[in-house]
């Protein structure tokens, strides 16, 4: 370090003398609590703040980016698909949340199951779900997709798409409004931010 330049330091609770940034390992700093702050990264952040950089955990950064670029697979099976289409139109505009439709499962992060799932359609649903890359999410939209709905007692209807694929968000209603689907999308984004996706 050059002579005459002030040294940057971090004040650590329980210690009266400043600890020079980047000079000590995290475990050797007295009073270190990882839930409150990290003196090491505080020092790095202070040094990089005026240069236009910011430091964050990689998992937080990845989940933040992932929630802003969710591509959904259109899987409209019945009348709920009309509301799903309406949510994409200019009045509700799901794309402002970074939620854009894709026709290929290999380019999709989210599948919206909208409508009545029949026994004949269940294998096709599972095949499309298996083609989606990890991490993948499923939104079950409407009473029929959630639990059979009107057709619960029919011999040809699957009583909930969660018997075929794992479901992350349930959107109730018959059919649910476009606002309900938008709310479900926002809940999915919160869930992704909260849980993260990097395996430890």
UniProtKB/Swiss-Prot annotation:
InterPro entries: NADH_UbQ_OxRdtase-like_20kDa, NADH_UQ_OxRdtase_20Kd_su. One of its GO terms (biological process) is aerobic respiration. Binds 1 [4Fe-4S] cluster. Disulfide bonds: none annotated. The keyword Signal does not apply. [4Fe-4S] cluster binds at residues 79-80, 144, 174. It comes from the Bacteria. Its main location: membrane. Its cofactor is [4Fe-4S] cluster. It catalyses: a quinone + NADH + 5 H(+)(in) = a quinol + NAD(+) + 4 H(+)(out). GO terms for molecular function: 4 iron, 4 sulfur cluster binding; iron ion binding; NADH dehydrogenase (ubiquinone) activity; NADH:ubiquinone reductase (non-electrogenic) activity; quinone binding. NDH-1 shuttles electrons from NADH, via FMN and iron-sulfur (Fe-S) centers, to quinones in the respiratory chain. The immediate electron acceptor for the enzyme in this species is believed to be ubiquinone. Couples the redox reaction to proton translocation (for every two electrons transferred, four hydrogen ions are translocated across the cytoplasmic membrane), and thus conserves the redox energy in a proton gradient. This is NADH-quinone oxidoreductase subunit B. It comes from Caulobacter vibrioides (strain NA1000 / CB15N) (Caulobacter crescentus). The gene is nuoB.
